[in-house]
From Swiss-Prot:
Belongs to the NrdR family. This is Transcriptional repressor NrdR. Its cofactor is Zn(2+). NCBIfam families: transcriptional regulator NrdR. Binds 1 zinc ion. Residues 46-136 form the ATP-cone domain. Negatively regulates transcription of bacterial ribonucleotide reductase nrd genes and operons by binding to NrdR-boxes. The gene is nrdR. It comes from Renibacterium salmoninarum (strain ATCC 33209 / DSM 20767 / JCM 11484 / NBRC 15589 / NCIMB 2235).
Length: 163
């Protein structure tokens, strides 16, 4: 790696640490020529392939901006959105793919958003899945109710098992 100060083509790694979220490695380097230290951050690349076929780097900011409109007027904080974007990125990276279709990013948003806020989920899903009628909304609401019933049944069963 070139030294940013003297452009010497070599450097020595002095220290390496994994970032807090585990998505990157921070390295302290020292140039053997000028002996100055600098920091580099290494991440794996994740490319989103848009409908047009053009690829662009994955952006948590784009995920947050896309979900923010669905969350307007809801009790969802900026921190909640940041956590959601991180969860979406982690889920996508866990698939092991270096490239992912934009459509798949939208699908990866739906699960964490549903856990965060059901109304925001319905708003996002209505646009993302192109709801065309009231029946589409009713169907999505029925699925949410069914899942809530299943979750409630599981919680009841846990409470009954405990002495």
């Amino acid at each position: 790696m070139y030294c940013p100060f003297c452009r010497h083509p070599d450097s020595r790694v002095v220290d390496s640490r994994v970032s807090d979220d585990g998505s990157s490695i921070r390295r302290r380097r020292q140039c053997p020529q000028c002996e100055r230290r600098f920091t580099t951050v290494e991440t794996t690349s994740l490319t989103v392939i848009k409908r047009s076929g053009i690829g662009e780097p994955f952006s948590r900011g784009k995920v947050i901006n896309g979900v923010r409109k669905a969350c307007q007027g809801r009790p969802v904080s900026e921190d909640d959105l940041a956590v959601l974007a991180q969860e979406v990125e982690e889920n996508i990276r866990a698939s092991g793919a270096a490239e992912i279709e934009a459509h798949e990013v939208g699908l990866a948003i739906l699960g964490p958003l549903q856990k965060l806020d059901k109304i925001a989920y319905l708003r996002f899903a209505s646009v993302y899945q192109a709801f065309e009628s009231l029946d589409d909304f009713e169907h999505a609401i029925e699925i949410l109710r069914h899942e809530a019933d299943l979750d409630g049944s599981a919680e009841s069963a846990k409470k009954q098992v405990r002495p």
